[in-house]
Regions:
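Non-catalytic DNA-recognition/assembly elements of restriction-modification systems
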Residues: 1-19, 137-153, 164-208, 335, ...
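Sequence-specific dsDNA recognition surfaces
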Residues: 7-19, 27-63, 197-212, 226-258
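Short coil/turn segments at secondary-structure boundaries
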Residues: 19-26, 120-122, 192-195, 212-219, ...
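A generic structural signal for short beta-strands and their flanking turns/coil linkers
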Residues: 23, 87-89, 219-221, 238, ...
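Short, solvent-exposed loop/turn positions at domain surfaces
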Residues: 52, 79, 163, 209, ...
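A short beta-sheet element
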Residues: 54-56, 60-110, 250-307, 329-330
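A short glycine-rich beta-alpha junction/loop motif
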Residues: 68, 83-91, 123-146, 281-288, ...
Length: 383
């Protein structure tokens, strides 16, 4: 097994888009979820109104990876994906197949081994990213081609199994959304004739989080907008730390049952909402609103309501756009209309979701085990 510069094993490709008629799908770095496109986060653009970063065209067989430091996003381009426009925040490459199997190159670019070197060699004053000069510093171990093909076949098999697990997770989420509509109907048409109110009528306390910056080695864990998923889950796999005076803690810490509303983000992500379901004390960041509800509504019901497709459309229409971000402030959030089914029916929905979450947990565990196996194989060959 020999060592080579990674640019010996791949060629940087991609170009600027030619003028086109009608609309195309624009895929930003934020629209790629690790290894697949989340179409809920894409935009339809024309040639003339596309964002300045929507300036990368690709071909079938290319591989994309995000240039940004600390970002794991890798995409294999098939025929349908080749029709889209991509952000210049991606680097497009193609395998030098005399040295590197194309399928294995994809897995390598998604591996911890590559990402570690990418981050070490990234540069930039504000947002660090890998450049061509940085790529020239990355050295990898290269097995012979027959060994590469065997490894790629094993990794592809693991990926297929992981994809099936992810499909199961999506199905569980859709099941919960369908059950919500079945029990309560859509809003504002309110076909079941429930009592209506505004969020202001059902809250006991509404506060912004702290505007203080995260610090290395801070005393408290810091819950930020990135810890709320688009689907309405709490994800604490990547948390920061913060120092904050004791007299400010009560105003900006979270407790079990708090509803967390992301007030500032890109336009498509404003309004992401989840319920804090942990006992650990965490400090809340300022781009998130902490909502404590009255007994008229269950926190899980309010969160599910704000994460429905009809609420997502409403939030998209009401948020105020600024350069690079959009916003819904606390007063505007409280003006949102809502229906109020009986709490017993709300509880029935919450129990259904809890049972579904248990099934999701089992699938997620299987997914984690496959991820460990995949990393073990990559470590064996490239570590």
């Amino acid at each position: 097994m020999i060592k080579r510069n990674i640019l010996d094993c791949m060629t940087i490709v991609g170009g600027t888009p030619s003028r086109f008629e009608g609309e195309k799908t624009y895929v930003s770095t934020g629209a790629v979820d690790c290894d697949h496109v989340d179409y809920a986060q894409t935009e339809r653009v024309t040639y003339d109104n596309r964002p300045s970063r929507a300036n990368l065209s690709v071909a079938e067989g290319d591989i994309l990876f995000a240039k940004m430091c600390g970002t794991k996003k890798t995409l294999r381009i098939d025929r349908p994906l080749s029709e889209h426009l991509y952000s210049t925040g991606f680097c497009a490459v193609r395998a030098n197949e005399s040295l590197m199997d194309a399928a294995l190159l994809y897995h390598l670019l998604a591996s911890d081994q590559f990402l570690t070197q990418k981050d070490q060699n990234s540069s930039g004053a504000t947002q660090k990213a890998i450049t061509n000069a940085g790529l020239r510093k990355i050295v990898i171990r290269v097995p012979d081609l027959s060994e590469q093909r065997k490894l790629a076949a094993n990794l592809d098999c693991i990926e297929q199994m992981m994809a099936k697990r992810r499909e199961q997770l999506v199905s569980f989420d859709q099941l919960v959304k369908s059950r919500f509509i079945e029990l309560f109907g859509v809003y504002p048409s309110n076909p079941k004739g429930w009592e209506t109110a505004t969020i202001r009528d059902i809250v006991a306390d509404v506060r912004y989080g702290s505007s203080r910056p995260a610090v290395d080695g801070g005393k408290y864990p810091y819950l930020r907008m990135n810890n709320i998923t688009y689907g309405g889950e709490l994800d604490l796999t990547d948390t920061k730390r913060i120092d904050i005076p004791d007299n400010e803690l009560d105003k900006c810490t979270v407790r079990r049952g708090d509803v967390l509303f992301n007030r500032t983000n890109s336009k498509e992500l404003v309004g992401k909402t989840c319920v804090y379901n942990r006992d650990e004390m965490m400090v809340l960041a300022g781009f998130v609103i902490r909502v404590r509800v009255t007994e008229r509504v269950l926190p899980e019901f309010l969160s599910a309501f704000l994460n429905t497709d009809f609420s997502k459309q409403m939030l998209l229409g009401m948020c105020k756009a600024a350069i690079g971000q959009a916003n819904i402030n606390a007063q505007e959030m409280q003006n949102i209309g809502i229906y109020l089914p009986p709490t017993e029916l709300q509880r029935q929905f919450v129990q259904f979701k809890e049972q579904t979450d248990k099934s999701k947990l089992a699938v997620q565990k299987g997914l984690q085990e496959l991820e460990i196996l995949k990393k073990s194989l990559m470590q064996q060959y490239f570590g």
